[in-house]
Design a protein with these regions (language model features):
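ATP/NTP phosphate-donor binding region
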Residues: 1-77
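Conserved beta-alpha junction segments in alpha/beta enzyme cores
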Residues: 24, 28-29, 175, 179-212
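Short acidic/histidine-rich motifs immediately flanking catalytic phosphotransfer sites
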Residues: 75-79, 234-235
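N-terminal glycine-rich "phosphate-gripper" loop used for MgATP/nucleotide binding
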Residues: 80-91
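Short, acidic/small-residue loops that bind anionic groups at enzyme active sites
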Residues: 97-121, 129-135, 280
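Conserved anion/nucleotide-ligand pocket segment
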Residues: 127-193
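Internal helical hairpin/lid segments
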Residues: 199-265
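ATP/nucleoside-binding phosphotransfer catalytic cores, i.e., glycine-rich phosphate-binding loops
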Residues: 242-323
Length: 323
């Protein structure tokens, strides 16, 4: 597959906002997020159905959501597409997208949470580099200098390095080169076995998860392991971001009677699940449902180095994600 790098974003560019999953939860926060984008010198025009509601938890019908995305890619004046928020059911949109249109009209598309469903599927179907970062509705909360700097360095300047803000944690040492794929863990594993899942050969996976229980996270990890992609020419390394608001245990009330083992943590779970695999594992990286989050491109090649000689874990793109 030919890799397509979108054009750099520039001050004065016209951008749009779509809602591929759940409806806008807070109109006030949504408007504040738009103002944050405007403060960066961008002209923002929301899509036609961005504030639509269908049923109890969808931002319009799947047809409406797909139409907004297809129209955004078809509009030559639009230079980037942002997602309003996350949620679920972006997967209903996947069969309705015009991937040939997207391939012929490449542009920046950035999202978070369930948006990872679209980001990985679009890369898988077209080769277009996409971007995992933030949602507009939450951007005003996450518009810290670190978040904004990371976003601008990747999409405007063509930066290739990721600067740690906190202490990244090495769970397993090693060095790997591969194509960055991932985003939200559950959204990604839901793509496994479908035509919307990217080719996982020579890949480095990166995951965030939030507002869940460790049992559910481990279930998603097990689905990943059972796909038999953690050996040979497939996954070369795994990066975990911040695991936010993950309750230890299960959401099943019948399990509340069971005592938590001493020292039981998410890090312990990650170490245990990936112990048999000889690939580097990095955790606590600065991305996820936090107010200081990196923008990470999906589909571009990167190098991760967690060997002992490194004073700090190292992550770098082999080339810019934009042109």
């Amino acid at each position: 597959m030919r890799i397509i790098r979108p054009k750099k974003l520039k001050v004065g560019d016209l951008v749009t906002v779509v809602s591929p999953s759940q409806p806008v939860a807070s109109r006030r926060n949504f408007k504040r997020g738009i103002r944050t984008l405007e403060s960066l010198g961008l002209e923002v025009i929301p899509s036609k159905n961005v504030e639509a509601v269908f049923g109890m938890y969808e931002a319009g019908t799947a047809q409406q959501r797909a139409a907004d995305l297809n129209e955004a890619f078809a509009n030559d004046e639009v230079k980037a597409i942002f997602m309003s928020g996350g949620g679920f059911l972006a997967n209903k949109v996947l069969p309705l997208l015009d991937y040939e249109l997207i391939r012929k009209n490449p542009k920046i598309i950035i999202g978070f949470s369930d948006g990872a469903t679209l980001l990985n599927a679009i890369f898988a179907k077209t080769g277009l580099i996409t971007f995992h970062g933030f949602s507009v509705e939450h951007f005003f909360k996450r518009s810290t200098p670190y978040t904004v700097d990371s976003f601008l360095k990747i999409v405007e300047e063509g930066g290739v390095e990721f600067r740690p803000r906190t202490n990244w944690r090495i769970l397993k040492g090693g060095r790997a080169t591969g194509r960055l794929l991932g985003g939200n863990l559950l959204s990604f594993v839901n793509l496994l076995g479908t035509s919307y899942c990217p080719d996982l050969r020579r890949s480095i996976l990166f995951f965030e998860e939030h507002d869940d229980y460790s049992e559910d996270v481990e279930n998603s990890l097990t689905r990943l392991i059972n796909a038999e992609i953690l050996a040979g020419d497939y996954v070369q390394g795994i990066i975990f971001g911040k695991l936010v608001n993950i309750g230890l245990g299960s959401n099943d009330p019948d399990t509340k009677q069971w005592k938590k083992p001493k020292g039981f943590t998410m890090y312990q779970i990650l170490k245990r699940r990936f112990e048999p695999y000889q690939i580097p594992i990095l955790a606590n990286v600065d991305f996820g449902l936090i107010n200081t989050s990196l923008t990470i491109p999906i589909g571009i090649e990167a190098v991760m180095d967690t060997t002992k000689h490194q004073t700090r874990p190292f992550l770098k793109l082999t080339q810019p994600a934009v042109r």
